[in-house]
Amino acid sequence: MASVKAVSSAAPLALRIVAECPVSKARACSLTLPHCAVNTPVFMPVGTQGTMKGITADQLEDLDCQICLGNTYHLGMRPGPDLIEKANGLHGFMKWRRNLLTDSGGFQMVSLVELSEVTEEGVTFRSPYDGKEILLTPEQSIAIQNSLGSDIMMQLDDVVSSTVKGPRVEEAMHRSVRWLDRCIAANKNPDRQNLFAIIQGGLDAELRKACLKEMTKRDVPGFAIGGLGGGEEKDDFWKMVTLSTDHLPREKPRYLMGVGYAVDLVVCVALGCDMFDCVFPTRTARFGSALVPWGSLQLKQKQYAKDFQPIDPDCQCPTCRRHSRAYLHALFKSDTAAMHHITIHNISYQLSLMRSVRQSIIDQRFPEFVKEFMKRMFPSSSQYPSWAVEALQSVNICLS
């Protein structure tokens, strides 16, 4: 039986380390938040404007989703923080009884790069809705998130694409540290809302270390690893992840932003990450792609027209209990309900994967789980991604 270790953290968040892998950096924790406890490692589905695309709040709760995301930038535009505050925050507005994490709006510096300009004051966006210019400062980002009432808030950071090099990366890192201090000062609800810092520094190890050194001086409830998953080489990606977890405090949660592919999740748990989010499972569902332990099924393809198996015979989600691949294939031709059913399955797959990862850590068999996972995901070991093999070897998990 794994030993239970109690670790204190700043209220209103508490992190209890339930078990640690004796070989790698993987760990299973219980994260106490205002609306419920969150078991980690955890995958968090993303709802841009207060809802998941293709799934309701009740259905998410039925899948035992303990925490999901909302987007501060888009919610700040539509329907606006004043209206949401009148509905008793985003929880009341979307009738969600579990935890919410809101991002800061900073990622839109990359995703809407042609519509934005960054200065020390903040980031100026040209609204994609009406073309008006909007200045988002650290103070305004926190004010919006205070109105939304999320359980975890993210600092506004200066985000640059992971493929950018040169002085802009260093500028963004130092500015993110300064903006963190402004966000901390602006938070009106430190007793109810947890503000996470976001580590920046691009693919430069020295800049990452400098950011880690400065940000960990601040007594924030948790830390996110930002600026990755944006098209950089996977060899660079995993090295920045493990460098970050090496320097982050053991007693605080570690959130790797924007990561959602199954292999990436498993490898990055091994590297010491606790929390993940990505639009991938919902976005790919809209194109008819269903996630399975051996990869994905493209249900629009003709080969599934007469296939009466569920998406995954071992899956217990509502979609797999009721519908066949053939039915979903046929539904795609005439009804958007197919996307809805596949979205439910894909989110269930991600949540179930993380529950299995967690249980393997508690049972002290995480390295064995990783080997079994990789064998099922890839037809042969020769097809294992070299970056994943190297990353796992760095934490003493050998796949050969």
UniProtKB/Swiss-Prot annotation:
Principal location: cytoplasm
Keyword annotations of the record: Cytoplasm, Glycosyltransferase, Membrane, Metal-binding, Mitochondrion, Mitochondrion outer membrane, Transferase, tRNA processing, Zinc
Cofactor: Zn(2+)
Disruption phenotype: Decreased postembryonic growth, characterized by shortened body length.
Gene Ontology molecular functions: metal ion binding; protein heterodimerization activity; protein homodimerization activity; tRNA-guanosine(34) queuine transglycosylase activity
Keyword Glycosyltransferase in annotation: yes
Catalytic activity: guanosine(34) in tRNA + queuine = queuosine(34) in tRNA + guanine
EC number: 2.4.2.64
GO cellular component terms attached to this protein's record: mitochondrial outer membrane
Topological relation to the membrane, as annotated: Peripheral membrane protein
Gene Ontology BP terms: tRNA-guanine transglycosylation
SUPFAM superfamilies per the UniProt record, alphabetical: tRNA-guanine transglycosylase
Location of this chain's protein in the cell: Cytoplasm; Mitochondrion outer membrane
Ranges for region RNA binding: 258-264, 282-286
Active-site residues, Swiss-Prot/TrEMBL: D103 (proton acceptor), D277 (nucleophile)
UniProt: queuine binding residues: D103, S104, G105, G106, F107, D157, Q200, G227
Binding-site residues, Zn(2+): C315, C317, C320, H345
Function statement: Catalytic subunit of the queuine tRNA-ribosyltransferase (TGT) that catalyzes the base-exchange of a guanine (G) residue with queuine (Q) at position 34 (anticodon wobble position) in tRNAs with GU(N) anticodons (tRNA-Asp, -Asn, -His and -Tyr), resulting in the hypermodified nucleoside queuosine (7-(((4,5-cis-dihydroxy-2-cyclopenten-1-yl)amino)methyl)-7-deazaguanosine). Catalysis occurs through a double-displacement mechanism. The nucleophile active site attacks the C1' of nucleotide 34 to detach the guanine base from the RNA, forming a covalent enzyme-RNA intermediate.
HAMAP family membership: Q_tRNA_Tgt
Family, as annotated: Belongs to the queuine tRNA-ribosyltransferase family.
PANTHER family in the cross-refs: QUEUINE TRNA-RIBOSYLTRANSFERASE CATALYTIC SUBUNIT 1
Record's subunit section: Heterodimer of a catalytic subunit qtrt1 and an accessory subunit qtrt2.
Protein's recorded name: Queuine tRNA-ribosyltransferase catalytic subunit 1
